[in-house]
Amino acid sequence: MFHLGWFLGSGFGIQPWNPAGGDGVYTGANMRDWMKPDLYVDLAASLERACFDYILIEDTAMVEDSYNGSAEVSLRRGFMAPKNDPMPLVPLMTQRTKHIGIVPTVSTIQYHPYLAARLYTTLDHLTEGRVGMNVVTSVTDRVAQNFGYDQHFDHDERYKMAEEWVEVVKQLQHSWDVDAVIADDVNGIYADHTKVHPINFEGKYFRSRGPLNTIPGPQRDIPVVSAGGSVPGRELAARHGDTQMAMCKTVEDMKAYREDIHRRMLAHGRKPSDIKLLFLATPIVAPTDAEAQEKAEALRRYRYTDAAVEYNLWNMSYTSGGRIDFGSIDLDTPVDQIDLSKGNGERSSIANLFQDTEGKTLREVAAESFQITDLGLVGSPDTVAAKMEEIMDEVGGDGFLLYSPMTRHSIAEIADGLAPALKRRGAIRDGYTYTTLNENIHEF
């Protein structure tokens, strides 16, 4: 069996709302209601019925203005903004569910480790052990400037900072011994003070005395999720990750990625089974194979439209950390002439976008290259389920992190079409053995 997760790629932000902008005809009331909890609560209930492990909620705290030197496109089309803080949404998403995990993103420059440790421990209690933390370093200078920095740290230094951040959080999570809470109402003793300890951490980036003033939650150690595919990002996952989002375009890339992470884990004294790698994919599902192929062809044609090219150029600018304005580059420029080294953002994502693009122009890359691909998962539910099983058999595991436009129609295609087909094949779980996210991730 393999695992399934859902990537809520727009975070607690505006969801697909614009049929004229390529969002399709099933956008419903997203434009008016994206900031209300109902859509997300329904998502959690649907995906628990489908037996997903977790929902990963993207987040970033800025209004992007590097594309054409303006926030005009970002705000006109709703790219990355507006967006709400996902943390208050987490307990709401667990109210109609009992098992599925909710993994909000936390940035190591936005949250001090003490604040994060206290917040996630609180969420661990409120969700009864179903929260995880998606640890990111943030991408752009604009995020850093919103939190008091002149500009963002260089890429590799961000990950050194993140390593230290995770270490502080983990020490704080263990600042209460497992038997520190006595809860003796007869003798009037709540906790044993000798079993609650300062951590007195002093590092290059963070200092914290501790202890936490919250008691350990059901999981105690909140599962760590990460997404970085660069060498420092892989090292972070190998040292601390419980599950990782992996972005690959081919089965060969997936196998190589998994083998590399496992080698790094062994070097850090961890077992490869300690982490579950979920590969990003956008399956294209329809009632029949022919209809799915028609959807895929329509999507391919749309990618050459001005609206789609504008989005991809905008996304490239953002992904570079806001350091390269792809809107200012002539579309007929050969990509070999573009200096990508100036970027300071998602290094592996930029590499993914420009993989195998030698001899192409920026126009061609903007129309043909996307960070998340379908991995060949195009067809009826049974066809896609068989292909997913085939890929996992070849790669060796551990599962898929599915990304699809956030509409009730697309959710139903996965939860009520694809997932039942996978269950019939015995490819995914048909129920939950445990109640906490940590246990469900590591069950198999």
Residue positions per predicted region:
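Active-site mouth loops of central-metabolism enzymes
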Residues: 17-38, 105-114, 150-152, 218-231, ...
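Hydrophobic faces of well-ordered beta-strands that scaffold small-molecule active sites
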Residues: 2-6, 55-57, 100-106, 129-135, ...
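Catalytic cores of nucleotide-enabled group-transfer and carboxylate-activating enzymes in metabolic
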Residues: 62-63, 82-85, 92-105, 223-226, ...
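Hydrophobic or amphipathic alpha-helical targeting/insertion segments
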Residues: 96-147, 153, 161-165
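An alpha-helical appendage that flanks or caps ligand/catalytic pockets
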Residues: 1-19, 28, 156-219, 252-259, ...
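Acidic (Asp/Glu)-rich catalytic clusters
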Residues: 48-49, 91-98, 124-130, 266-272, ...
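Conserved, mostly hydrophobic/aromatic
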Residues: 4, 47, 51, 93, ...
